[in-house]
Amino acid sequence: MGYLSLFSKWKQKKQEKEAERVLEESISKRKDYWNTIGHVDGDVLTHLLNPMFFGGPAWPSGRQTFIRVQKTETVILASDGLSDPFQSPEEKSRTQGKGLEFYIECDDESLRGPLSDIQDHWAFDLLYQMSQNAAAHPNMLELFMKHDILSIEFTDLDVPSHFVNENGEIGVLLGVQSPSVSASLSLPYESIKLISMKLLTPNELEYVREQGAQGRRQLAETFQLSKSYHITMTKRESLI
């Protein structure tokens, strides 16, 4: 075996150890942060069989997990893996994966039930669909760096009926600032964005469609002034 071959193997093992260290530190730092916000379960929400093996989008390290954070009056569900460092051999950049994680904070008390039941809840389904969209999107972080506040639409999700328009469409405002959750989090390679998700009423969705970026910003400001912020209240009046 030549010296170059030995050096190549040594370098590969070193890179693998470094990748493992950064992955573990990333997971730990995210959990430590969420523990400052509320009580984090010891277990995570994940799949028995990873969807990426069945045609689903690949997450940076392959981990597709979610966590629950219980606060006094609300519960947060958050993605946990979109900001893992890339593990594939061809990905050599020292980045924190997609550079962001999503979360939804809700006042639905049923979210405090057994963790095994959470995957059947509409809030988890909403977070899951958003996370899969981000995993599949090549430059979602760049969009948030440019616009701060974005919106997205879904169909065929079993959210409370007053958030669904006559065509079965559901609007979500992304990036409304929280008074308690930081907008960013420092991880080993770089800081990532923590992106909130807030369900919109049909009137609010129509306003965003008509007004575009300005409408999204104005609606986010209205939520701030109303002190509902980023939180999805299961029962609330439309602000438009």
Question: Where do the protein language model's features map onto the residues?
Answer:
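Acidic, proline/glycine-rich low-complexity IDRs
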Residues: G2-T72, S93-G97, Y103-I240
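A sequence-level detector for low-complexity, Ser/Thr- and acidic-rich stretches
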Residues: A78-S79
